[in-house]
Amino acid sequence: MWVVGLIGVAVVTILITQYVYKWRNPKTVGVLPPGSMGLPLIGETLQLLSRNPSLDLHPFIKSRIQRYGQIFATNIVGRPIIVTADPQLNNYLFQQEGRAVELWYLDSFQKLFNLEGANRPNAVGHIHKYVRSVYLSLFGVESLKTKLLADIEKTVRKNLIGGTTKGTFDAKHASANMVAVFAAKYLFGHDYEKSKEDVGSIIDNFVQGLLAFPLNVPGTKFHKCMKDKKRLESMITNKLKERIADPNSGQGDFLDQAVKDLNSEFFITETFIVSVTMGALFATVESVSTAIGLAFKFFAEHPWVLDDLKAEHEAVLSKREDRNSPLTWDEYRSMTHTMHFINEVVRLGNVFPGILRKALKDIPYNGYTIPSGWTIMIVTSTLAMNPEIFKDPLAFNPKRWRDIDPETQTKNFMPFGGGTRQCAGAELAKAFFATFLHVLISEYSWKKVKGGSVARTPMLSFEDGIFIEVTKKNK
């Protein structure tokens, strides 16, 4: 009997060994870039999710670039991935959207925003073009000039004056609420004064589960994330159904246009509208609120940066007939030092570890092959940490941007993506951040009370918040 048992153990051992071998050596056409597939089922997910208390490139990426080179293979949450920090390959991939690559998401993102099956926006269709055109019509330069800039300023003023009565508060969380209220208004007509839901808090909770292992069981970050996702989904769905029932009750937001196109575009469904609205809301809130939180961190650590900013914003006010008049588009565009400050914050504070694409066909490059169907993580933040372009790259120094010409900046600074997929909300994000700085620096004093420690896990976050006190200046 023991012989049968021994044979059984041997067979199981052989099968496991074969499985592990196949996992670590996936069958592909051509030669894979060097790398490791990690452990069966989970790959190298745990290494990617490890905490790094620094603004530097996450060690998962940095150490593998040092070991394997700028292109390497890995496996995250069970999905084989090619990671590229090679500038030439990255540029090629951005230019090949719709031909060699398309938009792609990790399982967590797909489940959060329903980006699976017919709802997954891919480059071979015109879904992204549609969403981009609608988003630009709402949040692009023309809308900012004619309407949004003034509304952004009103939103900022209301929140800052409210901050003076709060005592000590978390700037990152408060900023997330501020941006969420603004974005939700223009995306789905959300009225925060009448709603009991805290949109900013829901978005904050999203962040905790986005790159978690997609295990939807109670007690996990991803489970909590999915619960909050359902809350937000319900809010948007209710608004959408109200708008469909009464199309004439429009508010000039994204839902208005989507409802009009509901029966004219084959891919537009109610589920699609809700998914796109949620994705746009998340991207807007997280990028702007993180940047504002980092601004307070850098103000506390490098107070000298305020000298140029204070002088610039005082110059804007002194040229007005009425110092209390609203910020104009020309004034906003004249803020050179402010833009240098914003660039430096965004350079160091890239929220996401990389931009995801999917290979539509085998892609040969430098003797390697990126297999069809594999996910590609395009890491552009290595450019922002290149000491040949940005001297002492981990140092916060907005003045460095005075000497960087436009061509060098375009090639080495891609905070909003590249190719045809550059973020349609880039102008909105910059305008919101700049307007916030204008009102803050011109009219308020502040001090950091506690917090400010950051970490990449691998998304950038504040470990203990960034708590501040704000007071109105005496005129």
From Swiss-Prot:
Keyword Heme (UniProt): yes
Keyword set includes Transmembrane helix: yes
Taxonomic lineage: Eukaryota, Viridiplantae, Streptophyta, Embryophyta, Tracheophyta
Gene Ontology MF term list: heme binding; iron ion binding; monooxygenase activity; oxidoreductase activity, acting on paired donors, with incorporation or reduction of molecular oxygen
EC annotation from Swiss-Prot or TrEMBL: 1.14.14.171
GO terms (BP aspect): brassinosteroid biosynthetic process; brassinosteroid homeostasis; sterol metabolic process
Cofactor: heme
Subcellular location: Membrane
Pfam families found in the cross-reference section: p450
UniProt keyword list: Heme, Iron, Membrane, Metal-binding, Monooxygenase, Oxidoreductase, Transmembrane, Transmembrane helix
Membrane topology annotation: Single-pass membrane protein
Catalytic reaction annotation: beta-amyrin + reduced [NADPH--hemoprotein reductase] + O2 = 16alpha-hydroxy-beta-amyrin + oxidized [NADPH--hemoprotein reductase] + H2O + H(+)
Record protein name field: Beta-amyrin 16-alpha-hydroxylase CYP87D16
InterPro entries per UniProt: Cyt_P450, Cyt_P450_CS, Cyt_P450_E_grp-I, Cyt_P450_sf
Residues noted as binding heme in the record, renumbered to the chain: 423
Family listed: Belongs to the cytochrome P450 family.
Positions of transmembrane segments: 3-23
Function: Involved in the biosynthetic pathway of maesasaponins, which are oleanane-type saponins with diverse biological activities. Catalyzes the C-16alpha oxidation of beta-amyrin to form 16alpha-hydroxy-beta-amyrin.
Native species: Maesa lanceolata
Gene this protein is translated from: CYP87D16
Domain of life of the organism encoding this protein: Eukaryota
Main location: membrane
Enzyme kind, highest EC tier: oxidoreductase
